């Protein structure tokens, strides 16, 4: 039979206060989100690309004297169709205009349209969805509206509206925002129905807590990851909408640069002077891809179930 070596043990006094001490670090939701978000290498790479594109798109045009409609050099053959070099990084087109300037002016407009349309749709969708989820009378009406609108392809609605009201910056944003928000509202409504009747919400309602306060304090914080996921899907989608519509002459006016407009204008250069077509297209792909990857990683990180 083995014996216990008493020298390996030490008697200590009982300390009730020490036994109640919590040694685990305090949990911070947003710190955990940031930690999970930056853990992935794809986040760092794509976030770097996205930040660089956004900074150049919004800062460079402030100091450039670029005029998208300038054709004064059309007869100066010495500045036409210059391939990318140290002086003209992206080359020049048939009018002698710098493609570098055109790409960043166009990227700024495309990103602005996407961000503004996304914010408008999210604000309306979350607000209406919150009311939709807690009001049975509103639910009956909105379900009928949703059933009608959801059967029409969103892109078709945008095309019809832009064709009807004409090309323009705010016209395009209006067309993107007329009905798109209803899909977000329906998703918020479904999520609220999941959480509305949980025990702690029933207890709050029994104690007399106002319904709107329950939604704002108890339910909406649970939907952060869902809202972020929706936002990440909308941003690249609206950029693609703008590019598609501008390519067919339905988006921005021909006098306003955008990535879609540049791709449309230089589509005949796919085989000759191909850089005019591929550089704007590559920029569009980089913007959309970086937005999607960064957004998806942020949505995953905002889900508390992924936190450790």
Curated annotation (Swiss-Prot):
The lineage of its organism: Bacteria, Bacillati, Bacillota, Bacilli, Lactobacillales. The chain crosses the membrane at residues 43-63, 111-131, 145-167, 171-193, 234-254, 274-294. GO terms for cellular component: plasma membrane. CDD domains: TM_PBP2 (cd06261). It comes from Streptococcus pneumoniae serotype 4 (strain ATCC BAA-334 / TIGR4). Keywords: Cell membrane, Membrane, Peptide transport, Protein transport, Transmembrane, Transmembrane helix, Transport. Belongs to the binding-protein-dependent transport system permease family. OppBC subfamily. PANTHER family: OLIGOPEPTIDE TRANSPORT SYSTEM PERMEASE PROTEIN AMID, OLIGOPEPTIDE TRANSPORT SYSTEM PERMEASE PROTEIN APPC. The keyword Electron transport does not apply. PROSITE patterns: ABC_TM1. Part of the binding-protein-dependent transport system for oligopeptides; probably responsible for the translocation of the substrate across the membrane. One of its GO terms (biological process) is transmembrane transport. This is Oligopeptide transport system permease protein AmiD. InterPro entries: BP-dependent_transpt_permease (IPR050366), MetI-like (IPR000515), MetI-like_sf (IPR035906), OppC_N (IPR025966), OppC_permease (IPR054864). It is found in: Cell membrane. Residues 107-295 form the ABC transmembrane type-1 domain.
